[in-house]
Amino acid sequence: MANSAQARKRARQNISHRNRNMSLRSELRTAIKHVRKAIGSADKNTAQAAYQASVATIDSIADKGIIHKNKAARHKSRLSSAIKAMA
């Protein structure tokens, strides 16, 4: 239990930061799912558009430090490779 005023404030901040981080991680997973779904539909133009939208989301989340920049690069690379592999 947080006893000092400083510890109570940090506990409050940790809760709000955790909620924000969880929301952003969920947004990241949703963006990736949209691209995967577009790739599954076999429409390259739709997949490309979904990829462009997801790249902005992935980069913004990496810039905020929610995920590491290498993880962001890995997601973008794998999605891009999957789109390029489409017939």
Swiss-Prot record:
UniProt feature coiled coil, ranges: none
Keywords, alphabetical: Ribonucleoprotein, Ribosomal protein, RNA-binding, rRNA-binding
Annotated region described as Disordered, given as residue ranges: 1-25
Gene Ontology, cellular component aspect: cytosol; small ribosomal subunit
One MF term in the entry's GO annotations: structural constituent of ribosome
Transmembrane residue ranges: none
Biased composition (Basic residues): 7-20
GO biological process: translation
Its job: Binds directly to 16S ribosomal RNA.
Protein family per UniProt: Belongs to the bacterial ribosomal protein bS20 family.
Name under which the protein is recorded: Small ribosomal subunit protein bS20
